[in-house]
Amino acid sequence: MESDPMFIGFGYDRHPLVEGRRLVLAGVEIDAPLGSLGHSDGDVLSHAIIDALLGAGCLGDIGTWFPETKEYKDANSLDLLKETVKILEERGFSVVNVDATVVASIVKLSPYREKIVENLKSALETSRVNVKFKSGNTLGFEGEERGISAYAVCLVEEKGCTKST
């Protein structure tokens, strides 16, 4: 039995934390004293996953598809993630799974995990989603509460690909 080809993607994003901005992860607003500075809503988790998915499909990166233009100013990154899934599907790919890690010490993120994962499962059209949170242990700009970062890895499957023998 032959299986469809599978491809791995890796994504990473980081943003400074500043006053006057919201902190959003996978469309979930986090109650925090500082928010993520970015052209869109600054959702580092969605951005890292977008880059992982585009990487798996050899389709460039988030800036290729969603440049820093007026069209994407303050954009909802969960919507951009849904659009990325459509871009992959149009090219014959489907998301198998995503595993991500968010690094931040500004606020405890684990109480938000269930809603974050729920949003990602819906956006990615897969039940195979895992999100982990790390504090940075007082190291780096995440540990010093000056920033937030996210790492993501994904597996996508190319559907209906025929192999010649």
Curated annotation (Swiss-Prot):
<comment type="subunit">
    <text>Homotrimer.</text>
</comment>
<feature type="binding site">
    <location>
        <begin position="13"/>
        <end position="15"/>
    </location>
    <ligand>
        <name>4-CDP-2-C-methyl-D-erythritol 2-phosphate</name>
    </ligand>
</feature>
<feature type="binding site">
    <location>
        <position position="15"/>
    </location>
    <ligand>
        <name>a divalent metal cation</name>
    </ligand>
</feature>
<comment type="function">
    <text>Involved in the biosynthesis of isopentenyl diphosphate (IPP) and dimethylallyl diphosphate (DMAPP), two major building blocks of isoprenoid compounds. Catalyzes the conversion of 4-diphosphocytidyl-2-C-methyl-D-erythritol 2-phosphate (CDP-ME2P) to 2-C-methyl-D-erythritol 2,4-cyclodiphosphate (ME-CPP) with a corresponding release of cytidine 5-monophosphate (CMP).</text>
</comment>
<dbReference type="InterPro" id="IPR020555">
    <property type="entry name" value="MECDP_synthase_CS"/>
</dbReference>
<dbReference type="GO" id="GO:0008685">
    <property type="term" value="F:2-C-methyl-D-erythritol 2,4-cyclodiphosphate synthase activity"/>
</dbReference>
<dbReference type="InterPro" id="IPR036571">
    <property type="entry name" value="MECDP_synthase_sf"/>
</dbReference>
<keyword id="KW-0456">Lyase</keyword>
<dbReference type="GO" id="GO:0046872">
    <property type="term" value="F:metal ion binding"/>
</dbReference>
<comment type="similarity">
    <text>Belongs to the IspF family.</text>
</comment>
<feature type="site" description="Transition state stabilizer">
    <location>
        <position position="39"/>
    </location>
</feature>
<keyword id="KW-0414">Isoprene biosynthesis</keyword>
<comment type="pathway">
    <text>Isoprenoid biosynthesis; isopentenyl diphosphate biosynthesis via DXP pathway; isopentenyl diphosphate from 1-deoxy-D-xylulose 5-phosphate: step 4/6.</text>
</comment>
<dbReference type="Pfam" id="PF02542">
    <property type="entry name" value="YgbB"/>
</dbReference>
<feature type="site" description="Transition state stabilizer">
    <location>
        <position position="135"/>
    </location>
</feature>
<dbReference type="GO" id="GO:0019288">
    <property type="term" value="P:isopentenyl diphosphate biosynthetic process, methylerythritol 4-phosphate pathway"/>
</dbReference>
<feature type="binding site">
    <location>
        <position position="13"/>
    </location>
    <ligand>
        <name>a divalent metal cation</name>
    </ligand>
</feature>
<dbReference type="GO" id="GO:0016114">
    <property type="term" value="P:terpenoid biosynthetic process"/>
</dbReference>
<feature type="binding site">
    <location>
        <position position="141"/>
    </location>
    <ligand>
        <name>4-CDP-2-C-methyl-D-erythritol 2-phosphate</name>
    </ligand>
</feature>
<feature type="binding site">
    <location>
        <begin position="39"/>
        <end position="40"/>
    </location>
    <ligand>
        <name>4-CDP-2-C-methyl-D-erythritol 2-phosphate</name>
    </ligand>
</feature>
<feature type="binding site">
    <location>
        <begin position="61"/>
        <end position="63"/>
    </location>
    <ligand>
        <name>4-CDP-2-C-methyl-D-erythritol 2-phosphate</name>
    </ligand>
</feature>
<dbReference type="InterPro" id="IPR003526">
    <property type="entry name" value="MECDP_synthase"/>
</dbReference>
<feature type="binding site">
    <location>
        <position position="47"/>
    </location>
    <ligand>
        <name>a divalent metal cation</name>
    </ligand>
</feature>
<protein>
    <recommendedName>
        <fullName>2-C-methyl-D-erythritol 2,4-cyclodiphosphate synthase</fullName>
        <ecNumber>4.6.1.12</ecNumber>
    </recommendedName>
</protein>
<keyword id="KW-0479">Metal-binding</keyword>
